[in-house]
Amino acid sequence: IRKIFGNNKYPILIDQEGGRVSRLKNLISFDNLTSEFFGKKFINKPKEFNSFYKLFIDKTSELLKLIGVNINTSPVLDLRVKGSSNIIGDRSFSYNPKIVSKIGDFCINNYHQNGIATVIKHIPGHGLAKVDSHHFTPVVNKKLDYLRKKDFFPFKKKNSIFAMTAHIIFKKIDAQNTVTHSKKMISLIRKKIGFKNILISDDLSMKSLKNSISQ
């Protein structure tokens, strides 16, 4: 691919969070190293968290560079929310937005130091979804004031090069469109959350998106 484009830094992306979202299971097993696992380390054993999570990121980075990948769709900055779909579940660091934000910064900074670009997801937050967006369209009814203090909070002031949008409808802001298709939500991400870098979409084949690409 890079020879075709004449660019040895041409962006090649992978979804390698660790835990149950691992595209390299045939090469290395990260099944038990979930975001939830590291979130608990952060709370209960902070010194151990620093060394252990850094080692995890370093080893992941080494593997990605070995196979020629320079972008990882990590970290997940969605909150863990009781009663919501398990599509996020242990992929989240915590129920606490401040903890998620701090671990997110740690993850982003360490990947960047290793020469791997990050993709924070699923902006502006997937935690409140009660259905799996791979199969249905989640609708969130919370008001903006609540969302800004909770689900949107971990995405603020992040220096990630990329962010991935959530295929969710936030009914109080745009009742018709998922974030990915919503001018109102994209404006909110840019102006209220303050993310100015590159936005990319989650999988366009997911059932949460309706209509054709032209629409």
Name each region found by the language model:
Residues 1-3, 102-106, 111-112, 116-215:
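Second-shell residues forming the walls of enzyme active-site clefts
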Residues 21-24, 80-85, 127-131, 172:
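Short acidic/His/Gly/Ser-rich catalytic and metal-binding motifs that mark active-site loops
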Residues 14, 90, 121-123:
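Short glycine- and Lys/Arg-enriched binding-loop motifs that mark or flank ligand-binding interfaces
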Residues 30-51, 84-103, 131-149, 173-179:
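Glycine-rich tight-turn/loop motif centered on a GG-T
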